[in-house]
Amino acid sequence: MQGLSFTSTAATFFLVLCLQLGINEGQDNETIPQPLLFQLNVPSTPDENQEVDMSLTLQTQYKECLVVKAYLISNTPVDGGFNYIQTRCICNDHPTTLYWTFVVTQTLTFRIMVDIVKDKGICPNNVAVVPISGNRYFTDRTVYVN
């Protein structure tokens, strides 16, 4: 009986060792897809009282679609299109571009916020995912007025 116990213990140890090595190797070689990729176009030096056109292209490396809500925030009040909140469905085979138009009266620092949300009625058949790792992305920009 003792020989059988030693054999099963050795076999179990060998199996666990092989599985552990296989899992570690698989994780090291795999690249993690990014939930959101940004491409932002903002004029850097418009004239005072000039209308600024800003665009933000969003895409995902996920196989599934995401529902995103994008908006701008600033400590300086800005009227017009600056305050629009835009909600879209982003899929890996279809990047989406969002646009904002607003007038700058002074140098303006603002934040572009993109939240991955669970809103229904945006993606086809309401099929979309929210990543566990994080659902809020942002970047800061400054527009310097001449």
UniProtKB/Swiss-Prot annotation:
Keyword Disulfide bond on entry: yes
GO BP field: detection of chemical stimulus involved in sensory perception of bitter taste; negative regulation of T cell apoptotic process; positive regulation of gene expression; proteolysis; regulation of immune system process
Range of residues in the leader sequence: 1-26
Keywords noted in UniProt: Disulfide bond, Glycoprotein, Pyrrolidone carboxylic acid, Secreted, Signal
GO terms for MF: aspartic-type endopeptidase activity; identical protein binding; IgG binding
Database matches in InterPro entries: Ig-like_fold, Ig_E-set, PIP
GO cellular component: apical plasma membrane; extracellular region; extracellular space; nucleus
SUPFAM superfamilies listed in its UniProt record: E set domains
Record-annotated disulphide pairs: 65-91, 89-123
Subcellular location field: Secreted
Residues bearing PTM Pyrrolidone carboxylic acid: 27
Glycosylation, residue list: 29
Gene3D superfamilies the UniProt entry points to: Immunoglobulins (2.60.40.10)
Quaternary organization: Monomer. Interacts with AZGP1.
Record family assignment: Belongs to the PIP family.
Name of the protein described by the UniProt record: Prolactin-inducible protein homolog
Species the sequence originates in: Rattus norvegicus
Lineage per the UniProt record: Eukaryota, Metazoa, Chordata, Craniata, Vertebrata
